[in-house]
Amino acid sequence: MAPTKGSAKGKADSKKSNPLASASKVSKKKAAKRPPPQEVKSKARTEASQLKKTKKREYSEAELDLPKLNSITPVGVVKPKGKKKGKVFVDDPEGMATILAIVNAEKEGQIESKMMKARQLEEIREAKLKEAEARQAQKKSKLEEAKDSIRNKKKHKGDGNAKSASTTAQTNDSSSKSKGKRKSVSFA
């Protein structure tokens, strides 16, 4: 059940009976007033202050313990075992010049041998071409000889048998005419 109000009589009496309640009301001072809350706006990511990246620390080569390049180990120094082998560059120019001279001599020798091989291959190609031309000339000469011999045979036969050649030609013509008159059937 909901609470019920008391009678109006009781309330009026209670106010009169309480001497402090009838005294003039003095308002209590509230605690210091707060300013009204303001909306906090988040900054956009495209804003210049947000886009600036923080500088990363750059380490020097000494701090990183990187191996030094282009250095040769002195004669007395022994490399520790297990260390990875790499290219070792020469510091002194005389040593480098001698190494370069050796390498260049090897390369020149290879180049010279390549040139020699190329010359030999060229000579072989030329020889093969000459052989092929000679073969073709032989074939042509044989063909011409065969043609001449056939012509000579026809000339010798044609002198005595001129009439027989003409009669065989007529029979060949008549047989070709009969073959030409064949019936043909066409389908639509």
From Swiss-Prot:
Transmembrane segments: none annotated. Residues 130-151 have a biased composition (Basic and acidic residues). Residues 103-157 form a coiled coil. Residues 163-173 have a biased composition (Polar residues). The keyword Phosphoprotein does not apply. GO terms for molecular function: mRNA binding. GO terms for cellular component: nucleolus; preribosome, large subunit precursor. GO terms for biological process: intracellular mRNA localization; mRNA transport; ribosomal large subunit biogenesis. Its main location: nucleus. Keywords: Coiled coil, mRNA transport, Nucleus, Ribosome biogenesis, Transport. Residues 1-89, 130-188 are annotated as: Disordered. Residues 178-188 have a biased composition (Basic residues). It is found in: Nucleus, Nucleolus. Belongs to the LOC1 family. Required for efficient assembly and nuclear export of the 60S ribosomal subunit. Component of the 66S pre-ribosomal particle. This is 60S ribosomal subunit assembly/export protein loc1.
